[in-house]
Design a protein with these regions (language model features):
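NTP-dependent small-molecule kinase module
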Residues: 101-102, 164-208
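Conserved nucleotide-sensing/catalytic segment adjacent to the nucleotide-binding pocket
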Residues: 33-35, 42-90
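Post-Walker A helix-loop "phosphate-sensing" segment adjacent to the P-loop in P-loop NTPases
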Residues: 25-33
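P-loop (Walker A) phosphate-binding loop of NTP-binding proteins
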Residues: 11
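ATP-dependent NMP and nucleoside kinases share a basic, alpha-helical "lid"
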Residues: 94-148
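Phosphate-binding/switch loop-helix module in NTP-utilizing enzymes
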Residues: 71-108, 200, 206
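Conserved lysine of the Walker
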Residues: 16
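Hydrophobic positions on the alpha1 helix immediately C-terminal to the Walker A/P-loop
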Residues: 19
Length: 208
């Protein structure tokens, strides 16, 4: 069976990770590997922590698309990869990596997943999760305060100076590359069921 790569894109806080994980759970008993694009932020060891904090993490230049494309290619060939682990406190990659084994289905999510042509073409099914801006902002605030220990003022400043402008410039336009657009994120169970059915049909077809 040729591995099937499912790409799930959408703005920060859109619910794309929830959608991606629900898809991954629903396609069992096929083996599934899950990858988050955030792991592929560039490793700016040459910068100070303060300089790294000021970087625009929502611009395509923030990501190591070369490495991501190579590793997706390896997974598509049935090989395991060593995925980077990104530390959002130090804004650096950890020395350790995470082994992602070969799998029947590879699900990857990320805000700019469809911006890079090489990565986009690696995805056999492209899903864009479309959620209102106010909902995305609230979710981002909750996530960054709880999981990443960031102060509210810093989160809002980043949203206004980079997250929102980059969403309009890069994320939203990438929606045109999607095969399927999911409104309302992880709450849209009908859309997720339809996506899952499509994936299962393709898996069955590739295995026949």
């Amino acid at each position: 069976m040729t591995p099937l790569i499912i790409g799930v894109a959408g703005g920060s806080g859109s619910g794309k990770t929830t959608v991606a994980r629900k898809i991954a759970e629903a396609v069992t008993p096929a083996s599934v590997a899950f990858i988050d694009m955030d792991a592929y932020y560039r490793n700016h060891v040459e910068l100070t922590l303060e300089e790294r904090r000021r970087l625009n993490w929502d611009h395509p230049d923030a990501f190591d698309f070369d490495l991501l494309s190579r590793q997706l290619g390896a997974l598509a060939s049935g090989e395991a990869v060593e995925k980077p682990i990104y530390n959002f406190v130090s804004h650096l990659r950890d020395e350790k990596t995470l082994t992602i084994p070969a799998a029947d289905v590879v699900v990857i999510d990320g805000i700019l997943l469809f911006v890079d042509e090489r990565v986009r073409e690696r995805c056999d099914v492209k899903v864009f999760v479309d959620t209102d801006a106010d909902v995305r902002l609230i979710r981002r605030i909750r996530r960054d305060m709880k999981r990443r220990g960031r102060p509210l003022e810093e989160i809002l400043d980043q949203y206004l100076t980079s997250v929102q402008p980059m969403h309009l410039q890069f994320v939203e336009p990438s929606k045109r590359y999607a095969d399927i657009i999911v409104p309302r994120g992880g709450h849209n169970t009908i859309a997720i069921d339809l996506i899952t059915a499509t994936i299962l049909r393709r898996l069955h077809g590739s295995g026949s």
